[in-house]
Amino acid sequence: MTEISAKYEQLIEDLRRDYRPQREWGEGRGVFLVIGHFLVGVAAGAWLFGIIFNYVPGLVAGFLLAGGGGIAHLAFLGRPERFWRMVRHVRTAWISRGFVGLTLFLVGGVLYLPPLVLTGWPWAADSMLGYLGWGMAAFGMVVLIVYMGFVYTASKGIPFWNSPLHPVLYMAYALRGGIAALLVTMAVFNAPSVDATSLVTIWIAVTAVVIVLFALEIQGALTGGNPAARRSVREMLAGRMAVYFYGGTLLIGLVVPLALLSGHIAPLSVGILAAIGLFSALGDFFMKYTTIRAGIYLPLRPRQGRHVE
């Protein structure tokens, strides 16, 4: 009862505010949703680049990360045993579409991966079952890359999320996370067969795109005329989320990888590239965490004679 009472008191306190923060996603059990979205995005990106570079360890990493993301989603649900009911809303809900995409991705991976990593498997990767698995995983991968940003833009009550750039930004995060996963995988599996120069070049390009998109989204929130969106930006840049943004997103996710990439700290090696990938992925997690936690609801009722920036 203590926990319920605390949540009730917090809700009452929030309702008294003109601009109340969303707490369902990112606090308490809601952290599992952030983790789940982060993991499946990285998983889809890892699978994409694993296919492009014909790198089986990258495919394995993508499959394992997707499984972890699925577990995190189940941990978020109040009644995990009812997860299958989400498929009923696939026509109207992006979360349901994401569930379908994750299911197809995992089932496809089960069909396609084993003959690539195990000898004597009953079917080959280039058999009918193998091609079916490849197609299912590829379709699920596309859904996972695309759907996450739309989950947030569909939340009309939180203007900061309701940006046309948000889905594109999440797609870019999936690509950046996928490259990071491959950089880490090369060290973990001791299989540096991927062209590291190409991976790093793509990572730099995608990182530049992420920076531009994020700056445009912040600029749009500040100049769009919606005080709730401006309050969200303030929460992230100078409020309760600032330490996660500056310490996690900028320092861990951008400054440290670029410093390592410069070669001034240590010569580039498989281990340094893995560190770049790890810090990059952590920065992406903090970015998603801060933007989700910074969400501010529209006021329940207008206040006359007051203007809150």
Placement of each model-derived feature along the sequence:
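Membrane-interfacial segments
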Residues: I52, G78, T153-K156, V188-P192, ...
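Membrane helical hairpin/interfacial module
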Residues: A46-G108
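N-terminal signal-anchor module of multipass membrane proteins
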Residues: M1-V56, V60-F63, A294
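Long, contiguous internal "core" modules enriched in hydrophobic/ aromatic residues
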Residues: G30-V31, I35-L39, H89-A93, G101-F286
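Short, highly charged, low-complexity non-transmembrane loops/tails of multi-pass membrane proteins
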Residues: G295-E309
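Short helix-terminus and kink motifs of transmembrane alpha helices
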Residues: L77, E81, L213-E217, T290-I292
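Membrane-helix cytosolic exit motif
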Residues: L282, F286-L298
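Residues within alpha-helical transmembrane segments of multi-pass membrane proteins, especially transporters
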Residues: A43, W47, L64, I71, ...
